[in-house]
């Protein structure tokens, strides 16, 4: 099994060069915000291990909201983020990008502070890699190659299988045998591929096991202290929840139209959001701990198609900026934006509160998990205000939703079974 990983490179945009950067990024698209896989600057389609990628200018329109807490508006930079979700270690993917697309990357990064076009590109990229606070992968081990091969397999079988009803259950097993022979012939001829999974890297297995044990162990060690401090921590939390300002006005119509202009060109969409963490050590400490726990569940529990009860997210992550004064969230999800938000409100509003209620202006919560995102209008206004346009977005398998990936995988698994009953053969044929 090849595990997946994600990365985000962040660099400060040089003052006065943002407009030129945006114009360059626009040349990489075939549709608004949708990358041309073969664009001349960074041809994402040439990188066979890359699931998703994006380039986004992180210009936070809500920086002034923190003044509602009696804190002066900070002077924080505009950043450029290069983000990727890939098969295998993120470091290898970054190195591959630097080696094979160095000329285009230099054209992009020349708009950033401290970039030397004649210097070591890979070293610069590694130095600007941002550690992710938590990240989610829908199905650990499902590679780009597997997705494309199984999609081609489904199309080939669907075109071959007869549409007339079968005369008997026994005929289903015979037809399945014929289809297996057909696939074997197509694989031998090189027209189809069914590549077996690679061995799971030992280093990844060891790291996962250590992480599985280390976080609960740390929790046990700290438990006595938390019990002693819990009355004080609860008092601080409830005081802040009762007094923190809400900032949830409707988003400006022009901003909303700009965001919507970049959506719904495919069955999958992108989401990029940024916001300030509420001032004070308590909120900074609490959001850090909660994201450690969210990351733990994503790495060890939610690895097979679900993030809690939500099934429409391919990849997502949280990352801190500016010494944990700001938080970035990015995701790739199936369906429209409104349905995506409704999915969270109806199924895991408590999870939204855990992760995001530490942001300035979030709808007021109770006991950390209640209210907040459940106040639909306020939540939807809030998230749109904090959403940023994604200037360039790439996905390796357009037109294929997570439901399709699961369906295609079931077809392949049924094909590779050594023997099946007549009932199983009929059920498998119905998948086609």
Question: Each PLM stretch: what is its role?
Answer:
Residues 1-51, 60-62, 73-79, 85-88, ...:
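Short S/T/G/P-rich N-terminal loop/turn motif that feeds into the first structured element of a domain
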Residues 38-41, 87-122, 199, 231, ...:
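An amphipathic, aromatic/His-enriched active-site/gating alpha helix that lines ligand/cofactor pockets
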Residues 21-22, 66-68, 93-95, 284-285, ...:
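A short acidic (Asp/Glu
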């Amino acid at each position: 099994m090849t595990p997946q990983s994600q990365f985000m490179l962040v660099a400060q945009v040089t003052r006065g060069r943002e407009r030129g950067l945006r114009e360059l990024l626009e040349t990489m698209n075939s549709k608004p915000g949708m990358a041309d896989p073969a664009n001349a600057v960074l041809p994402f389609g040439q990188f066979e291990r890359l699931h998703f990628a994006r380039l986004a200018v992180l210009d936070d329109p809500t920086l002034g909201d923190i003044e509602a807490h009696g804190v002066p508006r900070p002077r924080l930079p505009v950043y450029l983020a290069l983000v990727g979700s890939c098969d295998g270690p993120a470091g290898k993917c970054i190195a591959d990008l630097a080696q094979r697309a160095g000329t285009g990357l230099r054209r992009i990064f020349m708009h950033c502070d401290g970039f030397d076009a004649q210097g070591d590109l890979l070293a610069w990229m590694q130095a600007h890699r941002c550690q992710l606070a938590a990240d989610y992968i829908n199905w650990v081990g499902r590679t780009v190659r597997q997705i494309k091969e199984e999609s081609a397999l489904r199309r080939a079988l669907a075109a071959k299988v007869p549409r007339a009803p079968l005369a008997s259950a026994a005929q289903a097993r015979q037809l399945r045998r014929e289809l297996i022979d057909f696939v074997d012939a197509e694989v031998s001829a090189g027209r189809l591929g069914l590549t077996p999974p690679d061995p799971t890297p030992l280093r990844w297995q060891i790291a996962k096991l250590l992480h599985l044990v280390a976080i609960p162990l740390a929790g046990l060690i700290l438990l006595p202290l938390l019990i002693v401090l819990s009355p004080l921590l609860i008092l601080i939390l409830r005081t802040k929840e009762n007094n923190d300002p809400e900032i949830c006005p409707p988003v400006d119509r022009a901003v909303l139209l700009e965001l919507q202009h970049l959506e719904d060109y495919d069955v999958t969409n992108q989401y990029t959001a940024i916001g300030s963490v509420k001032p004070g050590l308590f909120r900074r400490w609490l959001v850090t701990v909660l994201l450690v726990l969210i990351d733990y569940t994503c790495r060890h529990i939610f690895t097979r198609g679900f993030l809690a009860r939500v099934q429409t997210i391919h990849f997502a992550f949280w990352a801190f900026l500016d010494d944990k004064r700001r938080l970035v969230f990015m995701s790739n999800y199936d369906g429209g934006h409104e349905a995506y938000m409704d999915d969270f409100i109806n199924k895991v509003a408590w999870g939204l509160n855990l992760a995001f209620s530490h942001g300035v202006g979030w709808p007021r919560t109770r006991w950390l998990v209640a209210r907040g995102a459940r106040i639909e209008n306020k939540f939807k206004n809030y998230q749109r205000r904090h959403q940023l346009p994604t200037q360039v977005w790439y996905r390796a398998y357009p037109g294929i939703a997570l439901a399709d990936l699961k369906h295609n995988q079931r077809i392949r698994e049924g094909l590779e079974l050594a023997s099946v009953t007549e009932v199983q053969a009929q059920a498998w044929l119905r998948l086609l």
